[in-house]
């Protein structure tokens, strides 16, 4: 019987999150506990890259972390972002998040439909005159650079944040009694084994989001009970709802 589920992500900020509906429907408890956290660079670290934000006419956002840290650094460095700055986002949900910092205007905000940078590039190519700044995480690969170079776009990648471990303390390690653990990135899988080098799956169910995460879990010998996204279940919550429903029927 699955009752206690570890979700390796931050707790949802909205009270209307589907996770809470699932808890009520199936009598389960979700524990939200990220295995790593995102830390923004400070102004001094960013200045070391010798990049002037105001030299650019458009910003490309691949995540909410990128948005948060872009505007945090701008504020820290007392930079006023021009009204006519354009924003290109990999998907609409990220584009809408910009409203937290600036007024949302359709002529300034553009977004893709799949969440993949490769599918945003053709839209960016329609605005060849723009100079694109792309906030990234420390340790990023060169995929974005290659995609933008291929379209001959004027662009500059920059590091604005990094991922750091969010290790379990001794008390958390002793209290690790979950019936199911859900991972959202390969880093989460690595973090589990860093905190629990002798981890044995036994009867614990494992869920993963994304192909890379599933592969990382399987490479560690974990047996997966739940994988998302799928055409039928595009989100983890929709997949989780179906999974728990099936468990009840068995």
Question: Which stretches of residues belong to each language-model region?
Answer:
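Conserved beta-alpha
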Residues: 1-250
């Amino acid at each position: 019987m699955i009752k206690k589920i570890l979700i390796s992500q931050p707790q949802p900020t909205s009270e209307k999150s589907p996770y809470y509906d699932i808890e009520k429907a199936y009598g389960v408890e979700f524990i939200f506990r990220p295995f790593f956290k995102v830390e923004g660079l400070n102004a001094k670290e960013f200045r070391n890259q010798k990049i002037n934000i105001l030299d650019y006419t458009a910003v490309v956002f691949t995540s909410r972390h990128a948005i948060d840290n872009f505007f945090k650094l701008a504020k820290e460095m007392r930079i006023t972002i021009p009204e006519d700055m354009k924003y290109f986002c990999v998907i609409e949900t990220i584009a809408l998040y910009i409203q937290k910092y600036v007024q949302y205007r359709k002529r300034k905000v553009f977004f893709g439909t799949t969440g993949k940078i490769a599918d945003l590039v053709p839209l960016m190519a329609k605005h060849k005159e723009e100079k694109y700044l792309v906030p990234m995480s420390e340790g990023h690969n060169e995929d974005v650079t290659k995609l933008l170079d291929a379209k001959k776009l004027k662009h500059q990648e920059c590091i604005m944040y990094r991922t750091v471990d969010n290790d379990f303390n001794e008390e958390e390690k002793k209290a690790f009694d979950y019936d199911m653990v859900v991972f959202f990135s390969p880093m989460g899988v690595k973090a589990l084994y860093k905190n629990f080098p002798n981890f044995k799956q036994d009867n614990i169910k494992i869920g993963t989001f994304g192909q890379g995460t599933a592969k990382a879990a399987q490479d560690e010998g974990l047996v997966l009970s739940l994988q998302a996204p799928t055409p039928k279940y595009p989100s983890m919550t929709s997949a989780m709802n179906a999974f728990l429903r099936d468990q009840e029927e068995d």
